[in-house]
Amino acid sequence: IFGEESDINFEFPEPDKSKIITLKTILSSNPPKKYMLSDKLWKYLQDYAQKHREKGNGFGFGLNNEDGVARTMSARYHKDGSEILIKQKRWRNPRRLTPHEAKHLMGYTDDYAKLFGHQDGFPQVVSDTQAYRQFGNSVVPKVVEDIAQQIVSVMAEAITNKNSSGLIKSKF
C-alpha cells in the first residue's frame, strides 16, 4: 500500500507495546519431531554463523525463546528454518516452526480463516515447503489493515480540512 500527498505530513504512530504478541501464543505444545534440527544441521548452522562472525559479516541464525518475538519470516524458511529457530527444553537442538505455527505467525489465525468460511482454520493443501514459501512471501493481514486504517484516517482529516480553494490544507 502506498499513498502520497505532498502537503500532508504523516508519521506512523509508535507501536503499542502492550499489544506485542510473543511466540508462546502460536507455539504447539508437542510439535512433531521432524521439525527438530538434526545434529548435523545444527552443527552446520553454528559453524556457518561462527565463520561469518569472524569475517565481520552479519549472517546468523535466529534462536528464539517462547517469551520473545520472532524475526521476519522469509520465503527461504523451508531450506533450514535458520531465521526463526525455537529453543527447546527437552531436546538439545532447536526446532523450526511447523507450517501451522508459521501460518499463525503471519496472521492467518483460525479466527481470520472463519472470515473466509473455514470454520476449523485454513487447511494445508500444499507441501510444507510450499506452505513456508507462501507464508514467507505474504504480508501479515493485520499489518495491511492497520496501514490502510492510518491512510484512511489521515485522508479523511485532510478532506475535512480542505480550504475554500479546493486544495487540501493540512493542519499537521
Where are these regions (language model features)?
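C-terminal target-recognition/interaction regions appended to catalytic cores
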Residues: 40-172
